[in-house]
Amino acid sequence: MQQIGIFFGTETGTTRLVAKKIQARLGEAIAAKPLNVNRIEPAQLLAHDALILGTPSYGVGQIPGHSAGCLESNWEEFLAKMPADVSLRGKRIALFGLGAQERYAERFASSLRRLHDVLQGWGAEIVGGWPTEGYTFEQSAAVVEGRFVDLVIDQRTQGMLTDARLDAWVAQVQPLLLECLQQPQAA
């Protein structure tokens, strides 16, 4: 059986840490080793039908990358390398985003929504969604109809809640991702 691909962008290493925690919860038999998008080519991501993608928040809620002030290549540069005719139809994706609700309350985890919208525009099925309860912020582009588009982690302010949030979220998305891997693929 194909594995769930885990890919992330990071500037400080925190998104990588969370990606590794997710893989540990899923197990190596189910989930591939997390890979940084600044070290791979699009074909490596596109080879997976079930994906978990992680992003930090950066700038004023843009997709992280050089134009948002990142020193290293991130999602912005990776997405620019995707084929012009890319289609993510048939791919099921769960997302997680990092943010700092006290420091950036007016745009908390907004980069997650930007990545979500790009992937959905390419035809991906996004699974997950996450409640806003337990977070304190003024505004977030990542909130749609009263819920985050997917998991949000605030390692800076609420690091003590990360493990419990990951446990609950993995339990929610794992069966949906595995179901995608067990479906027969079109030729």
Residue positions per predicted region:
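A generic secondary-structure micro-motif detector
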Residues: 12, 31, 104-105
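FMN-binding flavodoxin-like domain, especially the glycine-rich phosphate-binding loop
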Residues: 17, 48-187
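N-terminal beta1-alpha1 ligand-phosphate binding loop
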Residues: 2-25
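Residues at the starts of beta-strands that form the adenosine-phosphate
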Residues: 2-4, 31, 92, 125
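Short helix-loop-beta junction
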Residues: 19-30, 117-121
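Structural alpha-helical scaffold elements that stabilize or flank donor/cofactor-binding regions
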Residues: 44-45
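A short beta-strand-loop structural module common to alpha/beta enzyme folds
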Residues: 29-41, 130
